[in-house]
């Protein structure tokens, strides 16, 4: 993309360098606004054209850049060519820049930036994304919330790029906790409470039975026996377990809907209780399964007894473990979906677990293990509601809504809203997501409610405010002015800065699609919003001549469109009034 300008520059370079234009596309980039000391719109990195060896000293590259620039000519697209630090710089014809960018944004709509030449030639893939994955009856902690919003972003971006994406929620719905839960429900459970608030009641039962099991060995033994009955397929035990699972999923779906998140498949460890036994047999048949003195079964991934490379795959009573069920799930998904890539989104504490799972798949003879990828993220500290620690996702959403409603009530400029609760939740979620996505996903960060809800500065509230403000401009002036426009009316520095920034959207999407880091898009949208705020003050529409007003309105409409596109990719629903 960059509206075809990048390709036009690549075509001219290809004639001089005798290289196909396709080989040059990724070496040509739009110049970020913050670096615009000069007037260039695009730059060619001379380093990226040369072989990366030590023979190319800095002066040589600078000389080559100068020689290359001298061989190039200005044309109807490029109005000026110059050299920078190891770069050749290109300035685009101003009227052409204005007309082409604005036309492209309006014509491409939600696809702006995604039809870029940066993405052409990339094969369409089938991608499985496993994310969120809470444990039934345990706390839906902040790690699950991070997994949910990060996984949703990755799935959104891959889908927008035309890939077939399968979103899987792999629930922790099996294991020893269900022995405790089954026993606990028989002791302390109430059917009415289970039906009215399943997640809350199961959690209360789970906490209570854990306390009892710690003090009373007979309760711990009963829990162990209940789980063994589950593993052996006891009808009564399975019926109770199924009820817990079904009611929990109904509740999850309702809460995920508030987040704007959905899944194509609600899977879980329980699906693989039988298939995990097949995995154990396969490991044994390949001579990879080793029995320990304690009666457990392990796989030695080092081959030389290194304790750090030992992975336990079976308990002494023959029941399966998390790793075994993950192996069975991966094999089943390949059979079912024949995926090109499978992405697991979990906290960085599971890094070793996934390394071992992928390694075991490989030594079992599954070459496609290389298509599996773990996207780890850091820990969030200090997220508490007013009632204390976060227990369930719904607590977070309710807290967001409450705090945002209070904020909106205290601001004089808040508009009369048809549904203030919905607006508050959408703005609050934007605030939460932007705070989370601003840094590297792998970084830990300290959560602050006060910082999240600041309306000024680099926050989600600021993005939503900018979108609502631009939408209000269109509502107020749109009918009279949104016809044809004169590009000569958008030559002020504020207009040009916005147009230059809009040029870069495809590069930002490309970067995020390569490293799965949403911060590139977040940074881009925040800069766009700051540029729009400056332009809104200086580029008046009211009382301007119709030709000027129309051109400016087109510019602001393009900004709002790209802002909305980027926000939706991040998992944010833009608001039109606030």
Swiss-Prot record:
InterPro entries in the cross-refs: aa-tRNA-synth_I_CS, Arg-tRNA-ligase, Arg-tRNA-synth_N_sf, ArgRS_core, DALR_anticod-bd, Rossmann-like_a/b/a_fold, tRNAsynth_Ia_anticodon-bd
Single Gene Ontology BP annotation: arginyl-tRNA aminoacylation
Protein family (similarity comment): Belongs to the class-I aminoacyl-tRNA synthetase family.
Annotated phenotype, changing residue 342 to V: No effect on mitochondrial membrane localization
Outcome recorded upon mutating residue 241 to R: No effect on mitochondrial membrane localization
Reactions the enzyme catalyzes: tRNA(Arg) + L-arginine + ATP = L-arginyl-tRNA(Arg) + AMP + diphosphate
Protein name, per record: Probable arginine--tRNA ligase, mitochondrial
Name of encoding gene: RARS2
E.C. numbers: 6.1.1.19
Keywords, comma-separated and alphabetical: Acetylation, Aminoacyl-tRNA synthetase, ATP-binding, Disease variant, Ligase, Membrane, Mitochondrion, Neurodegeneration, Nucleotide-binding, Pontocerebellar hypoplasia, Protein biosynthesis, Transit peptide
Disease linkage: Pontocerebellar hypoplasia 6: A disorder characterized by an abnormally small cerebellum and brainstem, infantile encephalopathy, generalized hypotonia, lethargy and poor feeding. Recurrent apnea, intractable seizures occur early in the course of this condition.
Residues that span the membrane, as ranges: none
PROSITE patterns per UniProt: AA_TRNA_LIGASE_I
Motif ('HIGH' region): 133-144
Effect after changing residue 441 to F: Found in a patient with complex IV deficiency and non-lethal infantile mitochondrial disease; uncertain significance
Database matches in Pfam families: DALR_1, tRNA-synt_1d
Chain sites annotated for binding L-arginine: 133-135, 144, 322, 326, 350
